[in-house]
């Protein structure tokens, strides 16, 4: 039996999928600031390059970002391609001598009534949000248990902990990620590998404005539905994630209001069910105007 000893980011090697924007880019910034070497993996190679360049300058282009301590390199990666994910992991292990942290973060969303989704859209969100995470785990986990150390960090959502009508396909995939992460965590505990699942409420990234069907306003839906004035800052979330990984926490749920919502879901699921149904009705009426 090997106790879990979370890797110290200083000197660690990490891969961040979806690292070219949003939460992924914030994770890259936090990891490099902490001294890690980060492979910024993204389907959009130009975005990955931009993030890698920004975080490895004397001071990040983002105002108020911490001074640089680590390094970064870009890589083009389609997480739906299992062979490509495995090849990247093997390449990193070969060139860096190992992989300490794998952040399976890439994701997409659709918002609107479920009957509007085409089968291609269903398959796309499953391929990226579920299979993409599975491909990361399949490639990195065996290496980590062979070494007896490492951390898998899976980006889910509050939509993976609570029902979320009108983003049903997204919530389904994020429930799958939560189930994968918490179940694998039980297996990995005696093998020295930590597994942490990240479940934020609305984060201030471009995904809030993507995947909209038939007039669905994703940004308003998330903010009004969660009763907040502004979405969570991705850099604040990234700091919480690294703290959660360092503490070998099973779940990172942010912000505080999201943790309260999660508790309500567990304590009063019937009440939550009625609240969500009422909010779906309100959102539909607002979209119809």
Whereabouts are the PLM-identified features?
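Canonical Rossmann dinucleotide-binding motif of NAD(H)/NADP(H)-dependent dehydrogenases/reductases
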Residues: 4-39
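Active-site-adjacent segment of SDR/Rossmann-fold oxidoreductases
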Residues: 34, 162, 183-194
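The beta1-alpha1 cofactor-binding region of Rossmann-like NAD(H)/NADP(H)-dependent oxidoreductases
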Residues: 45-46, 76-87, 119
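Substrate-binding pocket helix/loop in short-chain dehydrogenase/reductase
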Residues: 113-114, 118-126
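Active-site helix of classical SDR
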Residues: 137, 173
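Residue(s) in the substrate-gating loop at a strand-loop-helix junction
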Residues: 157
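SDR active-site lid
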Residues: 190-256
């Amino acid at each position: 039996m090997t106790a879990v000893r979370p890797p110290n980011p200083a000197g660690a090697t990490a891969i961040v999928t979806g690292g070219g924007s949003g939460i992924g880019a914030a994770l890259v910034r936090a990891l490099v600031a902490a001294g890690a070497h980060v492979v910024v993996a993204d389907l959009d190679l130009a975005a990955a390059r931009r993030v890698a360049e920004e975080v490895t300058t004397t001071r990040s282009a983002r105002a108020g970002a911490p001074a640089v301590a680590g390094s970064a390199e870009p890589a083009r990666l389609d997480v739906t391609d299992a062979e490509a994910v495995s090849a990247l992991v093997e390449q990193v292990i070969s060139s860096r001598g190992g992989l300490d942290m794998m952040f399976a973060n890439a994701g997409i969303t659709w918002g609107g009534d479920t009957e509007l989704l085409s089968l291609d859209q269903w398959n796309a969100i499953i391929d990226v949000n579920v299979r993409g995470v599975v491909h990361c785990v399949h490639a990195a986990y065996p290496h980590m248990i062979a070494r007896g150390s490492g951390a898998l960090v899976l980006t889910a959502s509050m939509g993976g902990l609570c029902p979320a009508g009108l983003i049903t396909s997204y919530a389904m995939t994020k429930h799958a990620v939560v189930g994968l992460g918490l179940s694998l965590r039980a297996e990995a505990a005696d093998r020295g590998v930590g597994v942490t699942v990240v479940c934020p409420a609305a984060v201030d990234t471009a995904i809030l404005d993507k995947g909209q069907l038939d007039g669905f306003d994703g940004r308003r839906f998330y903010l009004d539905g969660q009763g907040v004035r502004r979405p969570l800052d991705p850099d604040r979330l990234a700091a919480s994630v690294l703290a959660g990984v360092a503490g070998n926490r099973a779940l990172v749920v942010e912000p505080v209001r999201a943790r309260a919502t999660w508790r309500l879901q567990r304590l009063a699921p019937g009440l939550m069910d009625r609240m969500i149904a009422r909010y779906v009705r309100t959102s539909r009426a607002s979209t119809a105007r």
